Amino acid sequence: MNVDWPRFREVINAANNIVLTSHIRPDCDALGSCLGMAGILEALGKQVRIVCGQPVPENLKFIDPENRILCIDEDIEAKDFEDADLHIILDTSAWIQLGPMADVIRNSTYKKIIFDHHVGEDNIDAELFKNTTAEAVGRMCVDAAECLGVQLTPAISIPLFAAIATDTGWFRFNSVKEITYETAAKLLAGGAIPADIYRDLYERETAGRVRLRGTVLARIQTELD
């Protein structure tokens, strides 16, 4: 399925107050795509909020330094965005993956669209914008920026590079193709620094890791004594 980009542009141009949502148990493609899309839409003067069904996992908090991704019922309530006129669901086409946001979306009256690369879907009552050949929704977001005439900035490029890199196993999976590298190059030109993103993803010491290492070392010392 190919995205109808002229129709996508029409939908975006008609909206002013937009909510972005992705799936529970979020990964970098989900979170990075939400943040990248938020930057794209805000460049057009749109008001944007990101509201998901679960908090950002500890190991992925680096991707959202401004804490823009809100958790429903913890950081924000449904009544706080009743004034939205568009809800974009990214990186999923299934109710079950939306967690507590599913009922919020079901009960809402604003327009809903799905922006996704997965083949499977259920009966979410939303207009579909899907590219099932895309290796990541992050790549679709770059296409969206081009469709909407938005220049890639670091705030857009960094999360979208993380989205694509992680959903392709850091460019090792068979889903990687020529356009993947072309898109990655655009994101580098926009300000993404792969070495920094890789370090934040895989080499940063979390508090949990430090505590675990301390526990292991303490046990070793006890046994030696």
What positions do the PLM features span?
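Short, glycine/charged-enriched secondary-structure capping and boundary segments
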Residues: S33-L35, I63-E66, M101-I105, E127-K130, ...
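Structured helix-beta-strand junction loops
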Residues: A14-A15, E66, A84, S108, ...
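Amphipathic coiled-coil/heptad-repeat helices and related helical stalk/stem segments
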Residues: M1-F8, D73, Q97-L98
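Short phosphate-binding/catalytic loops that engage adenosine nucleotides
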Residues: K46, Y110, A192
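Active-site cofactor/cluster-binding pocket
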Residues: L70-E127
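Anionic-ligand anchoring segments at beta-strand to alpha-helix junctions in alpha/beta enzyme folds, i.e.
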Residues: I18-D83
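Divalent metal-coordination and catalytic microenvironments
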Residues: D27, M37, L60, I88, ...
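A structured phosphate/pyrophosphate-recognition subdomain
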Residues: N2-I24, G36-E42, D122-D225
